[in-house]
Every structure is written in structure tokens, then in C-alpha cells.
């Protein structure tokens, strides 16, 4: 089992795809890492030698911020925006889109499910 940056890579996937299971590594960054270490991208994770795994682990841990460190960095950046009172910080705090998207309609992912608003009650009939 190849374990890199605290993540168990899926055994039956190609190395190129398996590395993307690490938070902060997408396909292009995965390809950069593989090129730097000289590992064949078509190799399955289960077929990697210990030396290959060690090379990949060394490359990832020395040159990239991934997993917990990256999550902590993102949280600190958002907290800084909130603390200094910027517009972006307020939008983060209110749970609304931060980058200027419209909110009259759409923005459901960021705002959450719709909340039902009670309509007017009819007056009792005579």
C-alpha cells in the first residue's frame, strides 16, 4: 500500500490518477511530480517499487503544500480576510459568493437549500 502525505493511494489506479487523491494535487501537478521523479505514469500503484514510492513521497513532501498544511493555509487566509473586515471577508462570513457572482437567483451551492417562507393566510370565510 503506497502511503504519501498521510493518504493511502488506491492500489488499482495508475500512479498519475492515484496521486490526485491527495488534497492539493490535481492531474497537472501529478504529471509534474511524475516527470520530476522519472516514474512511468502508466504504472499501477500496486506495482510501484519501494524506491519509486520513496521518490514520490520525497518530491511531494519537499516541494508542495498538501493535505493538512494546505487546508490550514486556506483557513488562515480566509480568517485574515474576515479579521481585517474586507468585503471578501464579510461575504465569507455570511456564506455568500465571494467573487462577484449574482445572488438574486442561483448561488444555491453557497447559500444552501431554500428556506420556505410562509405565504399570507386567508381570512376566515363568512
Curated annotation (Swiss-Prot):
Residues 101-126 have a biased composition (Basic residues). Pfam families: Ribosomal_S13. Residues 92-126 are annotated as: Disordered. Keywords: Ribonucleoprotein, Ribosomal protein, RNA-binding, rRNA-binding, tRNA-binding. GO terms for molecular function: rRNA binding; structural constituent of ribosome; tRNA binding. InterPro entries: Rbsml_uS13_C (IPR027437), Ribosomal_uS13 (IPR001892), Ribosomal_uS13-like_H2TH (IPR010979), Ribosomal_uS13_bac-type (IPR019980), Ribosomal_uS13_CS (IPR018269). Belongs to the universal ribosomal protein uS13 family. Part of the 30S ribosomal subunit. Forms a loose heterodimer with protein S19. Forms two bridges to the 50S subunit in the 70S ribosome. Located at the top of the head of the 30S subunit, it contacts several helices of the 16S rRNA. In the 70S ribosome it contacts the 23S rRNA (bridge B1a) and protein L5 of the 50S subunit (bridge B1b), connecting the 2 subunits; these bridges are implicated in subunit movement. Contacts the tRNAs in the A and P-sites. This is Small ribosomal subunit protein uS13. It comes from Nostoc sp. (strain PCC 7120 / SAG 25.82 / UTEX 2576).
